[in-house]
Amino acid sequence: MLHTAFISNILANYLGAMSVILPNILTVTGDIKYIGAGLASVGILGTGVGQGLIGQGACLAIGRNPEMASKVTSTMIVSAGISESGAIYSLVIAILLIFVV
């Protein structure tokens, strides 16, 4: 008997607290999606660094061997496209978080 009253009291207090907390959590989730979109945009930093290193390597390679400029340039463009895909994925995720969720 004592345990039943104790547990029902705890359950009533828990539900009372949740009825106060849940509306606040639901209003905060609207703001959390912007934080998530910002964190998803962090992937763009790696893309910028990667493309910078690709450009640097291509310039150094063309400077050392100018005859291979066309091959180096085509390889650089393909590598930059592959590197850019990470930024595009980050952008898509950020847009989905802002407008869909």
From Swiss-Prot:
UniProt name for this protein: ATP synthase subunit c
Similarity section: Belongs to the ATPase C chain family.
One function term, GO molecular function aspect: lipid binding
Predominant location: membrane
Keywords for this protein: ATP synthesis, Cell membrane, CF(0), Hydrogen ion transport, Ion transport, Lipid-binding, Membrane, Transmembrane, Transmembrane helix, Transport
Transmembrane segments: 35-55, 81-101
Membrane topology note: Multi-pass membrane protein
Functional description taken from the UniProt entry: F(1)F(0) ATP synthase produces ATP from ADP in the presence of a proton or sodium gradient. F-type ATPases consist of two structural domains, F(1) containing the extramembraneous catalytic core and F(0) containing the membrane proton channel, linked together by a central stalk and a peripheral stalk. During catalysis, ATP synthesis in the catalytic domain of F(1) is coupled via a rotary mechanism of the central stalk subunits to proton translocation. Key component of the F(0) channel; it plays a direct role in translocation across the membrane. A homomeric c-ring of between 10-14 subunits forms the central stalk rotor element with the F(1) delta and epsilon subunits.
Site entry (Reversibly protonated during proton transport), positions: 84
Cellular compartment(s): Cell membrane
PROSITE patterns: ATPASE_C
GO cellular component: plasma membrane; proton-transporting ATP synthase complex; proton-transporting two-sector ATPase complex, proton-transporting domain
InterPro entries xref list: ATP_synth_F0_csu, ATP_synth_F0_csu_DDCD_BS, ATP_synth_F0_csu_sf, ATPase_proteolipid_c-like_dom, F/V-ATP_Csub_sf
Pfam families: ATP-synt_C (PF00137)
Subunit structure of this chain's protein: F-type ATPases have 2 components, F(1) - the catalytic core - and F(0) - the membrane proton channel. F(1) has five subunits: alpha(3), beta(3), gamma(1), delta(1), epsilon(1). F(0) has three main subunits: a(1), b(2) and c(10-14). The alpha and beta chains form an alternating ring which encloses part of the gamma chain. F(1) is attached to F(0) by a central stalk formed by the gamma and epsilon chains, while a peripheral stalk is formed by the delta and b chains.
Highest taxon listed in the record's lineage: Bacteria
